[in-house]
Structure formats: C-alpha cells, structure tokens
Amino acid sequence: MPQPLKQSLDQSKWLREAEKQLRVLENLVDSNLEEEKLKPQLSMGEDVQSPGKGEPLHPNVRAPLSHVVRAVTTDLPRLGNKLPARHHLGKLSGLYQMKGCTFNPEWKVPDISDTHFDLEVINECPSRNWKYLTPAKFWPKSISYFPVQAGVKPKYPDNVMQHESIVGKYLTRLYEAGILYKRISKHLVTFKGQPYNWEQQHLVNQHQIPDGATSSKINGRQENRRRRTPIKSTCRQNDTKRDSDMVGQVSNNRSRIRPCANNGGDKHPPATGSLACWGRKASRVIKSGSSRDSSASVDSRRRSKGPRGFSTLPRRETTGNDHHSSDISNSVEATTRRRSTPGESITLGDSSIIPDGTSCASDKDSSPKEENVWYLRGNTSWPNRITGKLFLVDKNSRNTTEARLVVDFSQFSKGKNAMRFPRYWSPNLSTLRRILPVGMPRISLDLSQAFYHLPLNPASSSRLAVSDGQWVYYFRKAPMGVGLSPFLLHLFTTALGSEISRRFNVWTFTYMDDFLLCHPNARHLNSISHAVCSFLQELGIRINFDKTTPSPVTEIRFLGYQIDEHFMKIEESRWKELRTVIKKIKVGEWYDWKCIQRFVGHLNFVLPFTKGNIEMLKPMYAAITNQVNFSFSSAYRTLLYKLTMGVCKLRINPKSSVPLPRVATDATPTHGAISHITGGSAVFAFSKVRDIHIQELLMTCLARIMIKPRCLLSDSTFVCHKRYQTLPWHFAVLAKQLLKPIQLYFVPSKYNPADGPSRHRPPDWTAFPYTPLSKAIYIPHRLCGT
C-alpha cells in the first residue's frame, strides 16, 4: 500500500487508494442489520451455509487475521429459534446437560479439622473488616423451608440409602469439627469446639433446661411435653420411695419414646432416648450427694471460660451392652449420667447410632469421653425444617476416592428470595499485570478450609439449615453455597494480607484463599514464608501445605495463569483443548445457546492472550441474550481458530508510553478530513449523510489504515471510548481490530487540528490540549507502591 509523504498528504496515488478504502468501509456501515443473518429468525433458515464435500476438518489459517476478519463480513454466522438443537460441542455440553455424576459407594469423608481462629487476631491485625466478621451476619429477605426428609437430593436414585448414609457421616464430621450446630429442640442446639465470645452468653447448663422446652414424637403422635402430667417436684430429697417410683416410670417409658432430635426421619431408629427428652425427669433422680461429688471433676479449660463453664459428672462402671441395656437400673443410671453431664451429646457414628460418649463407660473398646460439647440456647428459634439441600460428588477429577459435599442454597441467589450480595474489588487481568512486581521470586500460600474460618451469628445460622434425613444441622461457619461467603472471605484474607505486608515488609497480594508473597531476595523470602506460616497458625488459621510453594520460585501458577519473572501466559494444554473444540464445530448446524454459553466462557479467558477483541464474540453473545440457537459459518469458525493460533504472552508491569499525537481526524455529516502535524491534510467526501459518530469513526479507521500512526486525535468521545457494540457487527469488529493497538486522545473541537480542513480551512497545530478518556485502573492503596 502506498505510504504518503510526511510533508503533504495530497498525493494523487495515495488519495485514490484512500478513496477506495473509504468506500469499502462505507459499504460495511451501510449494510442494514435487519437484512443480515444476525437477526433472530422465526424459522430454522434453510439458507445457512453448509460445509462443502472437500472441506478439510481443520480451518485454513494461512491468511492474515485482517483478511480473515474481512472474510467474516461476507460469511456471517446466524441466529435461529428456540427449537431443540445440538447441546454438545466437542467435550463441552450445555449447562443443564452436565455429565452425570457417578455414585461411588466407597467414597471416603475427607479429614476436616477444627478451624477456630483466635479473636486475638483483631488486635494483631487491626482492620475495620473484623466488625463484619466477628461474627458475620446473614439476613435473607424471605426464606422457603423444606421438610427434613428432602435434605438429601435424590441425585443417585439407585443408591439412595448409601448416599444418605455417607451424607450423614459427612455432616457428623463437620459437626465434630465445630462447623455445624445440631438441633436438640426448638430452642436448644449443641456444638463442639471452643465457643466464641458471642456464644458464651447463650450457653446453658443441662440442669437449667425448663420443663416443657421440647417436644417429641410418641407412638407416631406429636405431643407437647408441657401437656403431659409431670411428676411433682415437691418431693423431699430423702423420700426414697418417690425416687424409686420415678426411676420405674422413667425406665418404663424409655421404650416408648423416640429422641426428639430425630427430626422427621425414621430411617435409623435410635437405640436410646435423647438428652432433651429425658433431661427433666432424669435430673430429678440424681441425689444431692452425687451432685456435690461431681463438682470435683471440673474441666479446667471450661472453668477458665467464665461463670458459664460447666462441670461433668464422673461415670460409674456398669456392665452390659453400651447401646441396648435391658437392665432397668443400668438404663436409668446411663440416662441419669447422660443428662447430668453437660459435656456430652448424641452424635451419629458410622452406623448412625448413638456414639460412645452417650453410653456406659465400661466398654474398653469405646471412644474416650467427649468433653468439648456445648449446649446453646440462642436468641432465636431453631426450625425443624431446612433451607438447603445436599448431595455428594467426587472431590475433583483427579481424586475420586474422597467425596465433596455440595450445598444448594440457591434460593438466596435466584427467584423471589434473591439477595443482592455486596460487591468487592477483584483484579482483572489488566490490573494483575500492573500490580505484580517484576523479576522477584514468589511464594504462594493456600488457606485450608478457608470458608470454615468465618464464624456466623447464631441467629444467622438458623437460616442455613441442612439435614441428612434424620438430624437437622445449622452452619456455625460460613458455607460455600451462599453468595455472601466469597465477600466475607475477601474481607478476611485482605485484613490478613495487609498485616503480613506491614509486619514482614514483603509484597503481599491476596485473592480469596490464595496468598502471593514477593521479595527481591529469595533467601529472605524463604525465611519470611516460614514466619508468616507460624504467625497465621498461632492465630488458629490453617495453611494447606499441599498447595503451598515450599520455597521461592521464579515461575508460579496463580489464578489460572503461568507467571514468570517478566511475563504472564496460559498453559499450552489449555490452548490445545480449545483448538480441539473449535475443530469439531460443524458448520451450518444449530447449537443450543447453553452450549454456546460454555464455549464463550472458555474463549473469554484466553481472549486477552490473542490478537482478537471482544467484538468477535458478539454474535454468540446475541444468541445467549436472546436464548436462541446459533449456527457457525465457515469463515467465523476460521476466525475463532485463527485466534487460538496467534498466542501471545503479556508483559508484567508494561511500560506506559504517552506518544506525541501527530495525526488528527475530524468529520462533518458530508465531509471528513485527516491532518498531519507536518502540515499536510486530505479531505474526503462521504457517499451519503450518516450520524456524526459514524462519520468520525470512518475517518479514524481510514487514518489508521493509510498512515498507521501510534496515536490519533479525535473530537468524538464515541470514537475515543472504543465501545462500538451499537454498530453493525461486521463493521464493529473491523473498527475494534484496527483501533485496539493504538492510543486515542480526545481533543475539543475548537482545538482539533483537523477541524479546519473538514471545513475547507487550513489546519492549526499551534495549540491543541488533549487527554485520554480511558478509565484509570483502580488499584488498592497498599498495592500502589510497587
């Protein structure tokens, strides 16, 4: 293509070439969108281009990208209707056609440890974030409750009982780790682990549970304990006859009463009575002498917690079966001791039967006595219903031996109960490129069970109820299925990252449960990482050392990117998978919009590492927005494949150059002008009158094609913002592709040097104030110093 002389732009040959290019651009603009193939059709559209007989399976990508883009303008993809279409594109499938989960009867429940961070972290890591986290609150606008029997989703119809059994074991493991509350009655729950300060005021002694606080099913009939005729408590302590009558009544009624915590599930009939059902009567059997004797075995750790720490009664050795004692006196003894011991509760074992902590202590094979169980009467009622449903899947594609618990609290994010969760800063790729330090060794840390570090207010926990079909549990820590949890985790790790950066003088970046530490000295960074891990563990924050970098490295994988000392890139395996998917596109066939949605998600991730732009994906976005089928054309498939071939890596902390503008453009409804800083100018007449922003963009694109400047001056904000989605698609793609690599500066019309030539006056380059209109990238203050 002929290049103009810098002294003047009015070269005859150059002008003829420029006029030709302008007419091509005008033809693209004048194509009416209603007549194009991008409009949703009422029929399937038989004129869709079909692949030829000799067409190769892989697209031809030898042509330059600019030629491929121009070819798409004549061979457009199409939108269809909402009839059933293909929902498989290579290995991708529609979101509602996910690969069915396979049940594994040998699933193991992963090890879940107690994650209780010390509240001293508020003083060690001062931040305003802690007032939102100690405790976190969750207040949905409205709640839909479901029956307890629907607690486990029927994900595996052929293995319902086994599925529910493993879910029960999983919930038991979470309960034992202090992550769940377990429902005892309408106003009473139990939990394990160390209580928080806000829970201390609601802890209760078992002996203080008032009469009539619970209800239970008796012979299949729901009765209120308050309505039953209780034994009068006016008896004297020395009246042994009345005591023996009470013992007989308690033991005789034992076989008829089910545990009141068996919330609607008869799948695993209990072997003994519940604590909450037997507490009021069994506690009266205890002699005052034994109560005095029990005061000697006070747990020192609980005593230090304050006046609400409770003592445990010593067990007496008995003989007989731990779970099914037929001897009346033994059963009453066990019931009495169980009721009088505030540090014990009924939990689910492997067989969903009462564990060793509630049975006699004479069995040498039984587990040691549980001492970290607490009873809490919150300032709320604990519903015998659930708000979320559960099912199990493989932990990940590489680990199918362990199960992962999926909690469905989608009612809080969609439908009539949808909540607007708070927004928080999350770095995009451009921000990440600018905040990462160049040429520094790096170490990554990963939090273990990150969400389970976040405690919830007990009243909020009652809104997050789940069940295995037998017991009702409430999340004491933040669950992963609620949209509020990522926001809380962001606050949590941000507060920790700020203190780590300040205390250890190291560059720190946090995103969800990932920490990235950078320092110029690798040896110093290695020692810092050990100090940081010790600091976090002293505060009760657990580190996943399996996913933590053991020593400083120069290349690290973070947020899905491969990051070395100077560049960011994407793994080659990901490119190969995407090329394979594009090769399997069948030209002319209709694809379901859900399948296209998944495909666009993969393309969006790699698009910044290509020479393409987001406008190239707009036809697929149109299909997703209108929820209609989509058909690929041959040229469009070639364009997508061409994008994956031009792989590039992005430089970390790119140099921001501000070149001096040397070319300016301007337009009127009838004429356009290009002006050079050397004084040369060229004026063009448009073939028809159009909107002024279209004419301005035409002249800017023409200047880019004919002169190839590093930057351009324009008095159109529409042109400078580079948002062309309102234009016909094929012209928007070309304009975005042409103007993406260069900087556009805005100049007021009265100072635009090209304003004179467009109005048949000489250009004026003496004074022209200009500014870029691109929005500055937001970077947190603590990351701005790098």
From Swiss-Prot:
Please describe, based on the UniProt annotation, the reported consequence of changing Y170F: 90% loss of reverse transcription
| Protein name as it appears in the record | Protein P
Q: Where is this region: RnaseH domain (RH)?
A: 654-786
The UniProt note on how this protein's activity is regulated states:
Activated by host HSP70 and HSP40 in vitro to be able to bind the epsilon loop of the pgRNA. Because deletion of the RNase H region renders the protein partly chaperone-independent, the chaperones may be needed indirectly to relieve occlusion of the RNA-binding site by this domain.
Q: According to the UniProt entry, what is the EC number of this protein?
A: 2.7.7.7, 2.7.7.49, 3.1.26.4
Instruction: Give the protein's biological function.
Output: Multifunctional enzyme that converts the viral RNA genome into dsDNA in viral cytoplasmic capsids. This enzyme displays a DNA polymerase activity that can copy either DNA or RNA templates, and a ribonuclease H (RNase H) activity that cleaves the RNA strand of RNA-DNA heteroduplexes in a partially processive 3'- to 5'-endonucleasic mode. Neo-synthesized pregenomic RNA (pgRNA) are encapsidated together with the P protein, and reverse-transcribed inside the nucleocapsid.
Family of this protein? Belongs to the hepadnaviridae P protein family.
Question: Encoded by which gene?
Answer: P
Keyword annotations: DNA replication, DNA-binding, DNA-directed DNA polymerase, Endonuclease, Hydrolase, Magnesium, Metal-binding, Multifunctional enzyme, Nuclease, Nucleotidyltransferase, RNA-directed DNA polymerase, Transferase
